[in-house]
Each structure stands twice: as C-alpha cells, then as structure tokens.
C-alpha cells in the first residue's frame, strides 16, 4: 500500500473517530493539540488503526504516535 493510500485511510479513520473535517487532518496534525483528542480518543483511534490495517501497535509504540504522520509512518514500516 502506498504512503498516499495509507494517509487517505488514516485520514478517513481519524475524521470518523474524532468527528473532525477531513481538511483538518494533515500529516503534521497532532491528535491532541490540533484535533482535540483526549486520552480515551487516542486509545480508540489506535484500536481502529490496528483493526483497519490488521496490525498490532504495542503501548510503547502507541505513545510515540502523536501525529497523523507518525501513524502513517508506523503503518508503512509495519507493512514493509
């Protein structure tokens, strides 16, 4: 899956999970600071990403995923 395809899928999941507009979801967008996610939202988002991409994101890795771009990079690395 290309980086662009991963970004589009992540963007779709983020807009649905956080009830934000797709235009607000950019690679540099912070889940908490820019998109208004709280800690529960973040956990639910990680679970949705795991399910959508059929991957497992350990807690240690999830703590380092703070932006949309971080999520895309992590998923890209897991699929490589």
From Swiss-Prot:
Modified residues (O-(pantetheine 4'-phosphoryl)serine): 39
Gene3D superfamilies, A to Z: ACP-like
Domain Carrier: 4-79
GO biological process, one term: lipid A biosynthetic process
InterPro entries in alphabetical order: ACP (IPR003231), ACP-like_sf (IPR036736), PP-bd_ACP (IPR009081), Ppantetheine_attach_site (IPR006162)
Domain of life: Bacteria
Gene Ontology CC annotations of this record: cytosol; membrane
SUPFAM superfamilies the record matches: ACP-like
Post-translational modification note: 4'-phosphopantetheine is transferred from CoA to a specific serine of apo-ACP by AcpS. This modification is essential for activity because fatty acids are bound in thioester linkage to the sulfhydryl of the prosthetic group.
Keywords: Cytoplasm, Fatty acid biosynthesis, Fatty acid metabolism, Lipid biosynthesis, Lipid metabolism, Phosphopantetheine, Phosphoprotein
Pathway info: Lipid metabolism; fatty acid biosynthesis
Subcellular location: Cytoplasm
Function: Carrier of the growing fatty acid chain in fatty acid biosynthesis.
Annotated family: Belongs to the acyl carrier protein (ACP) family.
Official protein name in the record: Acyl carrier protein
Source organism of this protein record: Prochlorococcus marinus (strain MIT 9313)
Recorded name of the encoding gene: acpP
């Amino acid at each position: 899956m290309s980086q662009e395809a991963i970004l589009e899928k992540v963007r779709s999941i983020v807009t649905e999970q956080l009830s934000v507009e797709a235009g607000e979801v950019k690679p540099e967008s912070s889940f908490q600071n820019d998109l208004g996610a709280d800690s529960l939202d973040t956990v639910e988002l990680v679970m949705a990403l795991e399910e959508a991409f059929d991957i497992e994101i350990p807690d240690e890795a999830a703590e380092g995923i703070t932006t949309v771009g971080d999520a895309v990079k992590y998923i890209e690395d897991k699929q490589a």
